[in-house]
Regions:
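Metal-dependent amide/peptide-bond hydrolase catalytic core
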Residues: 110-290
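Extracytoplasmic/periplasmic, Sec-exported soluble proteins
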Residues: 1-4, 195
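Histidine/acidic-residue-rich, glycine-tolerant segments that coordinate divalent metal ions
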Residues: 3-4, 9-10, 16-147, 230, ...
């Protein structure tokens, strides 16, 4: 979907470059830079001065969670804060026929993964929201050798700042305790990624208005906060500028564009580009072409 975002912004740049004499201000088009690598490329752009003098900022994300032609809007927190953890379970390698002479890091890592699931299930209040996902396990390179170590990598997503601050401690406690109980050790690294995207109330209300004006009131979907992270938060937090971020629907069952993002069969309904450009154009016209 990121190529769709780039296409939308290129269209906006072309459109308003032909209307510069009608703009009562300056329009800056910011293409997303290295969002996938925590802490995200947005903070680098902020440090480079891109946000200097900016009064407000708008963002969007194409989403197969919502039908094409619909806009997901919410006041306040839209996305979770997104962090990464890496764990190295260290054991003692050896021959697979002599496990008693080894400390098996594969079994150790398996127990750590199961233990981590208890954080959300048993150590977090039901009134809080969090997702902890183990997404990579790497270890061993032969069928008959118990390896010396196994690496585990995953992500943590939270909305509460207090809970976010507690997560590294809980992950470390479970990982180190499990490793010690099995005669091994482990190393835990925790990297803070993007903060939550917090939509400004005034701009969010304006977004609802322009969407309703351009596409009809039924195009506005009042959604719940979503768990995927987004480094747009750096523009509003570190950049010190109010912003609004909306979800642009691209789900169309007949076209086969209902697959989730990051699925190998994901396809984008390109009609969503029209709605994305329309949203940006409407917001810019309301602000700069009065």
């Amino acid at each position: 979907g990121h190529d769709g975002h780039a296409a939308i912004l290129l269209g906006i740049a072309k459109l308003f470059s032909q209307k510069t004499d009608k703009l009562n201000g300056t329009l800056i088009c910011i293409f997303q830079h290295a969002e996938e690598v925590p802490p995200g490329g947005a903070i680098e752009l902020v440090r480079a001065g891109v946000m200097d003098g900016v009064d407000e900022i708008y963002g969007l994300h194409l989403s197969s969670n919502y039908p094409t032609g619909k806009f997901g809007v919410v006041n306040g927190a839209l996305t979770s804060a997104t962090d990464r953890f890496d764990i190295i379970a260290v054991g003692k390698g050896g021959h697979s026929s002599l496990p008693e002479q080894c400390v098996d890091p594969i079994v150790m890592a398996s127990q750590i993964v199961l233990g981590l699931q208890n954080i959300v299930a048993r150590r977090i209040s039901a009134y809080d929201t969090a997702v902890l996902s183990v997404c990579q396990i790497h270890g061993g390179d032969a069928y008959n050798i118990i390896p010396g170590e196994v690496k585990i990598t995953g992500s943590v997503r939270t909305f509460s700042k207090e809970l976010r601050n507690r997560m590294p401690e809980m992950i470390k406690e479970i990982s180190e305790g499990t490793a010690r109980s099995m005669g091994g050790s482990c190393e835990v690294a925790y990297e803070r990624g993007y903060d939550s995207v917090i939509n400004d109330d005034v701009l969010t209300d304006r977004a609802r208005e322009v969407i309703a004006d351009w596409f009809g009131e039924d195009a506005v979907l009042e959604i719940q906060p979503v768990m995927p992270g987004e480094d747009f938060s750096a523009f509003t937090e570190a950049g010190g500028c109010p912003g609004v971020f909306v979800e642009i629907g691209t789900r169309n069952e007949e076209k086969g564009t209902a697959r989730p993002h990051h699925n190998p069969q994901y396809l984008m309904d390109e009609d969503g580009l029209y709605y994305g450009m329309g949203f940006f154009a409407a917001m810019v016209e309301r602000k700069l072409m009065k």
